[in-house]
Each structure stands twice: as C-alpha cells, then as structure tokens.
C-alpha cells in the first residue's frame, strides 16, 4: 500500500528534516487491512531517526501531536483503529512549541 506521510510543527526534525515521505508498506501477517496502530509502529521503526519518545508514547502519538487522515482528525475516525486505504495521506503536526 502506498501512503504519503507528512510531518510538521518540528516533527520533521525527527525524520532527518524531511517533511514529506512517499512510502510503500506491505500488509502485516497477510492481512488485508492496515490500521493506524500498524502504521505508527512502522513509522517508529523505519522513519524516526532520533528521539522517538518525542513522537510516540507507548503505542500511540504523544499528547500534542495532531493526526489527520485525508484531512480528517483521526479522533473522528477511530484513532489507532482507523483503517487505512491505499494512497491515503496522513499528516502529523506537533502543536507544542518552545518559546
């Protein structure tokens, strides 16, 4: 499955300062669905280059990270249980900024 992953609000610094990633992810365990929980695990293993604790806490994103799936807040679509489809666009934006 192909996805576009976008990181903003400083989260791109955890991914070698690359904001937009076009990725191909194989389905896990020959399943025909991929959930946000699966995607977050893949992102932690394959994209986050440093300080993963700044992006994730446990199996989910840290408080203060806004997640959009096709421009829709993931809280409206089931959060970790959100089912992803080919060519979805997932955006991660940190709402916490130093000052």
From Swiss-Prot:
Cell location: Cytoplasm
InterPro entries in the record: Beta-grasp_dom_sf, Mopterin_synth/thiamin_S_b, Urm1
Keyword tRNA processing: yes
Entry PTM: C-terminal thiocarboxylation occurs in 2 steps, it is first acyl-adenylated (-COAMP) via the hesA/moeB/thiF part of the MOCS3 homolog, then thiocarboxylated (-COSH) via the rhodanese domain of the MOCS3 homolog.
Pathway field: tRNA modification; 5-methoxycarbonylmethyl-2-thiouridine-tRNA biosynthesis
Pfam families named among the record's database cross-references: Urm1
GO BP of this protein: protein urmylation; tRNA thio-modification; tRNA wobble uridine modification
1-thioglycine: residues bearing it: 99
Protein role: Acts as a sulfur carrier required for 2-thiolation of mcm(5)S(2)U at tRNA wobble positions of cytosolic tRNA(Lys), tRNA(Glu) and tRNA(Gln). Serves as sulfur donor in tRNA 2-thiolation reaction by being thiocarboxylated (-COSH) at its C-terminus by MOCS3. The sulfur is then transferred to tRNA to form 2-thiolation of mcm(5)S(2)U. Also acts as a ubiquitin-like protein (UBL) that is covalently conjugated via an isopeptide bond to lysine residues of target proteins.
PANTHER family for the chain: RURM1 PROTEIN
Family of this protein: Belongs to the URM1 family.
Protein name per Swiss-Prot or TrEMBL: Ubiquitin-related modifier 1 homolog 2
Naturally occurring in which organism (per UniProt): Arabidopsis thaliana (Mouse-ear cress)
Lineage: Eukaryota, Viridiplantae, Streptophyta, Embryophyta, Tracheophyta
Gene, per the UniProt record: URM1-2
């Amino acid at each position: 499955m192909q996805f576009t992953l976008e990181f903003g609000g400083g989260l791109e610094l955890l991914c070698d300062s690359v904001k937009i990633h076009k990725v191909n992810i194989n389905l896990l365990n020959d399943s025909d669905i991929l959930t946000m929980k699966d995607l977050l695990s893949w992102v932690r293993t394959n994209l986050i280059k440093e300080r993963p604790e700044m992006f994730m806490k446990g199996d989910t994103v840290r408080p203060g990270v806004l997640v959009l799936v096709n421009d829709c807040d993931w809280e409206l679509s089931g959060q970790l249980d959100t089912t992803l489809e080919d060519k979805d666009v997932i955006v991660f934006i940190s709402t916490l900024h130093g000052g």
